[in-house]
Amino acid sequence: MTAQHTILKIRRPDDWHIHLRDDRMLETVLPYTSRFFGRAIVMPNLTPPITSVASAIAYRQRILAAVPQGDNFHPLMTCYLTDTLDANEIVSGFEQGVFTAAKLYPANATTNSSHGVTSVATISGILEKMQKIGMPLLIHGEVTDPAIDIFDREARFIETILEPLRQDFPELKVVLEHITTKEAAEYVIAGNDYLAATITPQHLMFNRNHMLVGGIRTHLYCLPILKRNTHQQALREAVASGCDRLFLGTDSAPHAKHRKESSCGCAGVFNAQAALSTYATVFEEMNALDKLEAFCSLNGPRFYGLPVNDSWIELHREAVTFPEEIALGDESLIPFLAGQSLNWSVR
């Protein structure tokens, strides 16, 4: 990374966790990612989910067809793990270069996760093969027991599910996605080279007070849910530490406006258009701009065993205002930081 006055030049970043959806939604949101990101790990929780090599290839083709002319963007596909998935399908997809990783959703933990895994024991054969071939496991790390408070579900998952899983499969590469708690940050930083984590813009910039005080701000509602400010501060300190197993994952998850602004609104924040500006803002606030490029552009490729991108982007320290709404056919999206401004723009 080079810095000259108010310009930061960094390797083109990658997004290691994104929801691109499909059809009109895909066509609407993809340009906000493909413009500045070289690659993205694409979540498989469509309806129906991506559980086969054939469906992953077809979805990748739909994504590539929606990439605007002039953008050099490569989607990295994932397989949705289920209790009944054939392990050979996973291995075949990975060896063919179709699947980059496999995603573990605890059943009913988040959007479109009803087909998810009911118990790690049911997929032990798959995990054994993934460990053998070096295929990363991506985890939505929350328990789904209704007796566990929603704000405690990540910490409980680490204690009761993730740690035993890592003991059973010590050389399985694991990414604990969108971490939100002090417990998760400490656990990952204390881990070994087989454990990494992604962190979203919203969990670095906001805490649950921002979502709940003075009125409910539905467009900050996501899963895992925003936590108290002590957890937010722990995440900020974690990225500022320079740990090379923490990297960018926006978890950008668009929903139409009417699906967010309802009596039972959907979980998900569409942040692709503001993500890099947000990360730069947070890293500057933490006096850690020298760590920004590694978080955005270097740590992820290193963990996945992929080359870094050979192109660059620039972040300029100048005000940028984000749109109030984004058209979605006859509907619209309300983006992260709608109508607000930050002091870092991307070129």
From Swiss-Prot:
Substrate binds at residues 19-21, 45, 140, 223, 255, 267. InterPro entries: Amidohydro-rel, DHOdimr, Dihydroorotase_CS, Metal_Hydrolase. One of its GO terms (biological process) is 'de novo' UMP biosynthetic process. The active site is at residue 251. Its cofactor is Zn(2+). It comes from the Bacteria. It catalyses: (S)-dihydroorotate + H2O = N-carbamoyl-L-aspartate + H(+). Keywords: Hydrolase, Metal-binding, Pyrimidine biosynthesis, Zinc. Its EC number is 3.5.2.3. Transmembrane segments: none annotated. NCBIfam families: pyrC_dimer (TIGR00856). This is Dihydroorotase. The lineage of its organism: Bacteria, Pseudomonadati, Pseudomonadota, Gammaproteobacteria, Enterobacterales. The gene is pyrC.
